[in-house]
Amino acid sequence: MTKLAQWLWGLAILGSTWVALTTGALGLELPLSCQEVLWPLPAYLLVSAGCYALGTVGYRVATFHDCEDAARELQSQIQEARADLARRGLRF
């Protein structure tokens, strides 16, 4: 099962649970305070997921390490490839 399928299954389960609780399809009588919290819950979860994603991206950018050795190695491989292609008659 792919990661997308796992997320879609999770969203389907959460969404169907939310719909069942908000519409009263299960026959449960929730107190008014629970209903007031339950209605905007998807919006709260969406905002929370967005904040988490933004924080994760910000943290990863802030702690990103430069790989100077790998960059030098890649540049040398590019030069070798250009020299090889020039030997074979390709012009850039």
Curated annotation (Swiss-Prot):
Substitution effect: residue 42 to A: In MDDGB15; uncertain significance
Pathway: Protein modification; protein glycosylation
GO molecular function: endoplasmic reticulum-plasma membrane adaptor activity; enzyme activator activity
Keyword vocabulary terms for this entry: Congenital disorder of glycosylation, Congenital muscular dystrophy, Disease variant, Dystroglycanopathy, Endoplasmic reticulum, Membrane, Transmembrane, Transmembrane helix
UniProt-reported outcome of changing residue 85 to S: In MDDGC15; when transfected into DPM3-deficient cells, only slightly restores dolichol-phosphate mannose synthase activity contrary to wild-type DPM3; reduced interaction with DPM1
GO biological process terms, semicolon-separated: dolichol metabolic process; dolichol phosphate mannose biosynthetic process; GPI anchor biosynthetic process; protein O-linked mannosylation
Domain of life: Eukaryota
Membrane-spanning intervals of the chain: 8-28, 37-57
Impact when changing residue 14 to P: In MDDGC15; uncertain significance
Membrane topology: Multi-pass membrane protein
Record's GO cellular component terms: dolichol-phosphate-mannose synthase complex; endoplasmic reticulum; endoplasmic reticulum membrane; membrane
Localization terms from the record: Endoplasmic reticulum membrane
Complexes and interactors: Component of the dolichol-phosphate mannose (DPM) synthase complex composed of DPM1, DPM2 and DPM3; within the complex, associates with DPM1 via its C-terminal domain and with DPM2 via its N-terminal portion. This interaction stabilizes DPM1 protein.
Family note: Belongs to the DPM3 family.
Involvement in disorder: Muscular dystrophy-dystroglycanopathy congenital with impaired intellectual development B15: An autosomal recessive, congenital muscular disorder characterized by hyperCKemia, myopathic features observed on muscle biopsy, developmental delay, mildly impaired intellectual development with learning difficulties, epilepsy, and mild white matter abnormalities.
Functional summary from the UniProt entry: Stabilizer subunit of the dolichol-phosphate mannose (DPM) synthase complex; tethers catalytic subunit DPM1 to the endoplasmic reticulum.
Protein name: Dolichol-phosphate mannosyltransferase subunit 3
Organism listed in the record: Homo sapiens
Gene designation per UniProt: DPM3
